[in-house]
């Protein structure tokens, strides 16, 4: 679990997302409250439940990006899913319980990787020993007394020399033969609606049939060291302990990001009796968000302390169109602002992996130096903002389209301009985009 303070979390999010301070503060406090709750003694700890968040804002302003970056900072089981993927129980499609099953799978993988990192040093030593045993087979004990001891000393000295060469990478390209555990063959089974759990158990049963068999392979030492380290680390893990920790991690620290929640509001389905009931999906979500117990192949998982963050553009619907019970499960409401011209400018240059830096790095691989003048950046931002206002407002995603169109010619002929410098100023931008951006019909299809 992350131990970062809210200010530190917001500072990290600022490196990748421009503006939206209210949303950043809300998720930062929610994440910090997970840590605070762990410091509270029982039985009060059990009574403290997370305050779920509803993020409201147009597309392309940073809702999904906040969730994506939060996942990296959280150091906790995290899943992002679209609410539109689910159907009411009884209809063809996925039911909402599969959210928790997917989350526990992520947690098991996370926990296994974390536990393997703890034993990796010891596993590497054992893997090196196995490789050295292949390179330097132990001599048979012949002779008595001093001769045998002298032979052992010589063998140990040789092993240490080879171990040093192995660690320095001098033996990486040498090939050896070794016996490795055969990977279990994957098996695809079509899952009937609502029977994903049984299907998973059948798949697991078949995959275990071939486990434990050895396969002789000829590989380079560099690859052999990695394969044997993974194999030795896996032997040191207690699978039951990993499962128990994973379930506990989901129950105490799990985060679910529900995107497109506005698409399952009842208003969107008025008069569409033939469609699958979206209101039914909302009712199915209720117990999950409030707290229930879901049966998974790793055991029962309680959702009482899982944090749910929902988001939606709410263009055609309002948060009040959600059923009242579900509205009450998301007490923290955060509105995200539409992006201004200044925001577009900052997105282009101020973030850690800005679009400008990305394109400069891409063209630098062909020895083309791309320079963006301040007036060129400003003009790009103005065009992106204007096109959003005239046509559909897709937020920051418009910048991808605009800058791709702007650099189309440079990217195409970069190989012919090696060693040259290309300056993108306001005049260059107007030449490349002016006509398209001003013609509404053209910009609707091109930008």
From Swiss-Prot:
What is any one GO biological process for this UniProt entry? proteolysis involved in protein catabolic process
Give the chief site where it resides: cytoplasm
Q: Where does ATP bind?
A: 18, 60-65, 259, 325, 397
MF terms per GO, please? ATP binding; ATP hydrolysis activity; peptidase activity; proteasome-activating activity
Cellular component, GO, one term: HslUV protease complex
Instruction: List where in the cell it is found.
Output: Cytoplasm
Show the InterPro entries listed in the entry. AAA+_ATPase, ATP-dep_Clp_protease_ClpX, ATPase_AAA_core, Clp_ATPase_C, HslU, P-loop_NTPase
Record keywords? ATP-binding, Chaperone, Cytoplasm, Nucleotide-binding, Stress response
Q: Which domain of life is it from?
A: Bacteria
Mind telling me which SUPFAM superfamilies this protein's record contains? P-loop containing nucleoside triphosphate hydrolases (SSF52540)
The record describes its quaternary structure and partners as: A double ring-shaped homohexamer of HslV is capped on each side by a ring-shaped HslU homohexamer. The assembly of the HslU/HslV complex is dependent on binding of ATP.
According to its UniProt record, which protein family does this protein belong to? Belongs to the ClpX chaperone family. HslU subfamily.
Role? ATPase subunit of a proteasome-like degradation complex; this subunit has chaperone activity. The binding of ATP and its subsequent hydrolysis by HslU are essential for unfolding of protein substrates subsequently hydrolyzed by HslV. HslU recognizes the N-terminal part of its protein substrates and unfolds these before they are guided to HslV for hydrolysis.
UniProt protein name: ATP-dependent protease ATPase subunit HslU
Organism field: Burkholderia vietnamiensis (strain G4 / LMG 22486) (Burkholderia cepacia (strain R1808))
Query: What's the name of its gene?
Result: hslU
């Amino acid at each position: 679990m992350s131990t970062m303070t809210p200010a530190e979390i917001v500072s990290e999010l600022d490196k990748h997302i421009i503006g939206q301070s209210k949303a950043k503060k809300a998720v930062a406090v929610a994440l910090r409250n997970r840590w605070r709750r762990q410091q509270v003694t029982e039985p009060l700890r059990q009574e403290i439940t997370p305050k779920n968040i509803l993020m409201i804002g147009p597309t392309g302003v940073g809702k999904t990006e906040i969730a994506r970056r939060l996942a990296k900072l959280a150091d906790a089981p995290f899943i992002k899913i679209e609410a539109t993927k689910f159907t009411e129980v009884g209809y063809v499609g996925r039911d909402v319980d599969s959210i928790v099953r997917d989350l526990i799978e992520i947690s098991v993988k996370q926990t296994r990787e974390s536990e393997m990192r703890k034993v990796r040093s010891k596993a590497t030593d054992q893997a090196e020993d196995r490789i050295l045993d292949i390179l330097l087979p132990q001599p048979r004990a012949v002779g008595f007394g001093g001769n045998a001891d002298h032979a052992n000393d010589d063998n140990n000295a040789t092993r240490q020399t080879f171990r040093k060469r192995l660690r320095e990478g001098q033996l990486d390209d040498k090939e050896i033969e070794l016996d490795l555990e055969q990977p279990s063959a994957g098996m695809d089974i079509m899952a009937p609606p609502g029977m994903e759990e049984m299907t998973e158990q059948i798949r697991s049963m078949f995959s275990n049939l071939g486990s434990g068999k050895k396969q002789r392979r000829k590989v380079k030492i560099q690859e052999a060291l990695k394969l044997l380290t993974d194999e030795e680390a896996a032997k040191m893990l207690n699978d039951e302990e990993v499962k128990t920790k994973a379930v506990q991690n989901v129950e105490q620290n799990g985060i679910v990001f529900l995107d497109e929640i506005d698409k399952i509001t009842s208003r969107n389905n008025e008069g569409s009796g033939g469609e699958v009931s979206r209101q039914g999906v909302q009712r199915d979500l209720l117990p999950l968000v409030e707290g229930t117990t879901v049966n998974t192949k790793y055991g029962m998982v309680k959702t009482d302390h899982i944090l749910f963050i929902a988001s939606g553009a709410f263009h055609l619907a309002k948060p009040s169109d959600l059923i009242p019970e579900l509205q009450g499960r998301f007490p923290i409401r955060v509105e995200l602002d539409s992006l201004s011209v200044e925001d577009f400018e900052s997105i282009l240059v101020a973030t850690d992996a800005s679009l400008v830096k990305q394109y400069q790095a891409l063209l630098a691989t062909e020895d083309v130096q791309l320079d963006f003048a301040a007036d060129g950046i400003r003009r790009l931002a103005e065009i992106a903002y204007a096109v959003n206002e005239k046509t559909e407002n897709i937020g920051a995603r418009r910048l991808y389209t605009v800058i791709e169109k702007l650099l189309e010619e440079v990217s195409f002929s970069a190989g012919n301009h090696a060693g040259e410098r290309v300056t993108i100023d306001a005049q260059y931008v107007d030449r490349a985009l002016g006509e398209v951006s001003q013609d509404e019909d053209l910009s609707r299809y091109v930008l």
